[in-house]
Amino acid sequence: MLPNTPRRAVYAGSFDPPTLGHLWMIRQAQSMFDELIVAIGINPDKRNTYTVAERQDMLCAITDNFPNVRIEVFQNRFLVHYAREVDAGFIVRGIRSTSDYEYERSMRHINSDLAPEISTVFLMPPREIAEVSSTMIKGLVGPEGWMETVKRYVPPAVYQKMIAEHHNNNA
């Protein structure tokens, strides 16, 4: 990295939907780097609950007070190649468990083989949100009392979107 070059990082995920764990990661990473790109990765083999546009809107809503964060979308390429394309020197990954660590450690080695100039930074969220995942959140929606439960794990803007979506699907 050249002197006076902004320290840019990429934090990627499906964000379907964004959780408090994602928000924690974004908050931490944006304080560590000059610029953080939150990149929605499109996997055509994965069935998503929310459209790319809806996920972008939710991410914009929860990051609007972070001036150094921008939301982008990428597909059909490795994350490390995307990071290189946007001149990011860092990839930020969350570690929630030992299985996450094992997987991310292996990916870090592969990424290093593909782009040795890009470093991977691991962040570990606090215990109270470490087990929160988008898949878990989606699995809670529906049964009686789901709204109070889900409210604990997602940012308010995401919570409102989830309520509206559930209402529209059941109207």
UniProtKB/Swiss-Prot annotation:
It catalyses: (R)-4'-phosphopantetheine + ATP + H(+) = 3'-dephospho-CoA + diphosphate. The keyword Methyltransferase does not apply. Pathway: Cofactor biosynthesis; coenzyme A biosynthesis; CoA from (R)-pantothenate: step 4/5. It is found in: Cytoplasm. The record marks H22 as: Transition state stabilizer. Its cofactor is Mg(2+). One of its GO terms (biological process) is coenzyme A biosynthetic process. ATP binds at S14, F15, H22, G94, I95, R96, E104, I129, A130, E131, V132, S133, S134, T135. InterPro entries: Cyt_trans-like, PPAT, Rossmann-like_a/b/a_fold. Substrate binds at S14, K46, L79, R93. The keyword ATP-binding applies. HAMAP family: PPAT_bact (MF_00151). PANTHER family: PHOSPHOPANTETHEINE ADENYLYLTRANSFERASE. Reversibly transfers an adenylyl group from ATP to 4'-phosphopantetheine, yielding dephospho-CoA (dPCoA) and pyrophosphate. Homohexamer. This is Phosphopantetheine adenylyltransferase. It comes from Neisseria gonorrhoeae (strain ATCC 700825 / FA 1090).
